[in-house]
């Protein structure tokens, strides 16, 4: 038979019960500690390891499960598309058409960075075989040769712009296939198609000289000076894009693929939700927003079929 409670009030009874439970739990811990101390050293170490595994294994299983559910995302990096000259950073129009036809025949769907970010941050579904086609620098030949092919194949691209070049060629227009860049009017025509997403490639940091390598911090340059320079450059293009197109980029493509730890800190502080690098490989998208930074890309060069480049990248990714 249970003994009658001798507490003067129900509240006192509750406090007494909680205290008894706390004392009981403490005694259990002390007993377990005593058992562990009584064990020989090797067994004592093993007991600690096993205790840790009870905590870590569920976390590892969760991480492994998330990785298993990761979505493979190839991002192809293009630059110029023109009929006469070709090389590492320039392919011919028939090569791009071959890429678009092959992708359509093999079940790929082109997506843009808004789709990628929405999947990672909000869980918005992606198509079964997503792929990003990114075009850097804002060349006029992209307007001439790429846009018609996008319309023909209903494909979408990410178009990363250099602000100063667009300003210059808006003021002094040129139809040179070899060196001209798009004007603001041409960019707006591309955006109006619904097939082009514009992103930030810097206003005027696309240079690789003794003075600076892309948007990298120089040796000996103070963090404050570098932060001010980078923010001012990128914000200028953000402001111009908002003014001339009504768009605000959320992705930054590193000029020449150069970056540092402070670069990413500044970019995140400015609200950029993703970055495109020149590191080679296939990306694996999870629901962790960290996977959106320094996204890998596969450079599409003349004479190297996209199908072969993708096969090699998938094989390397395992």
Language-model features: locations:
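Cysteine-centered motifs
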Residues: 5-7, 13
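Bacterial N-terminal signal peptides that target proteins for export
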Residues: 35-49
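Hydrophobic core
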Residues: 50, 54-58
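N-terminal pre-catalytic segment of deacetylase/amide-hydrolase enzymes
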Residues: 59-131, 293-301, 311-314, 318
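Metal-dependent polysaccharide deacetylase catalytic core of the NodB/CE4 family, i.e.
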Residues: 71, 76-86, 129-131, 151-260, ...
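Alpha-helical scaffolding within the catalytic cores
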Residues: 114-119, 142-146, 174-194, 280-284
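Substrate-binding cleft of extracellular glycoside hydrolase catalytic domains
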Residues: 115-116, 128, 132-141, 153-155
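A cross-kingdom marker for long, charged
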Residues: 259-262, 266, 274, 279-312
């Amino acid at each position: 038979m249970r003994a009658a409670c001798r507490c003067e009030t129900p509240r006192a009874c509750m406090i007494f019960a909680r205290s008894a439970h706390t004392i009981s739990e403490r005694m259990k811990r002390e007993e377990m500690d005593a058992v562990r101390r009584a064990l020989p050293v090797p067994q004592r170490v093993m007991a600690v390891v096993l205790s840790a595994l009870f905590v870590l294994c569920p976390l590892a299983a969760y991480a492994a499960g998330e990785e298993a559910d990761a979505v493979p995302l190839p991002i192809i990096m293009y630059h110029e598309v023109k009929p006469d000259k070709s090389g590492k950073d320039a392919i011919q129009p028939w090569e791009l058409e071959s890429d678009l036809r092959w992708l359509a025949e093999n079940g790929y769907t082109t997506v843009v960075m808004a789709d990628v970010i929405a999947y990672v941050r909000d869980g918005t579904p992606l198509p079964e075989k997503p792929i990003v086609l990114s075009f850097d620098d804002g060349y006029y030949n992209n307007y001439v040769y790429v846009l018609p092919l996008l319309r023909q194949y209903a494909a979408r691209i990410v178009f990363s712009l250099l602000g100063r070049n667009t300003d210059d060629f808006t003021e002094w227009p040129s139809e040179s296939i070899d060196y001209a860049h798009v004007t603001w009017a041409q960019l707006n025509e591309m955006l109006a198609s619904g097939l082009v997403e514009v992103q930030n490639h810097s206003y005027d940091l696309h240079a690789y000289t003794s003075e600076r390598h892309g948007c990298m911090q120089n040796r000996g340059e103070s963090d404050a000076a570098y932060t001010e320079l980078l923010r001012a450059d990128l914000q200028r293009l953000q402001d111009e894009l908002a003014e001339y197109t009504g768009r605000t980029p959320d992705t930054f493509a590193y000029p020449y693929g150069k970056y540092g730890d402070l670069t990413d800190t500044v970019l995140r502080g400015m609200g950029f939700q993703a970055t495109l690098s020149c590191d080679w490989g296939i990306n694996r998208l999870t629901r962790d927003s960290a996977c959106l930074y320094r996204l890998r890309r596969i450079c599409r060069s003349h004479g190297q079929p996209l199908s072969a480049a993708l096969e090699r990248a998938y094989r390397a990714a395992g």
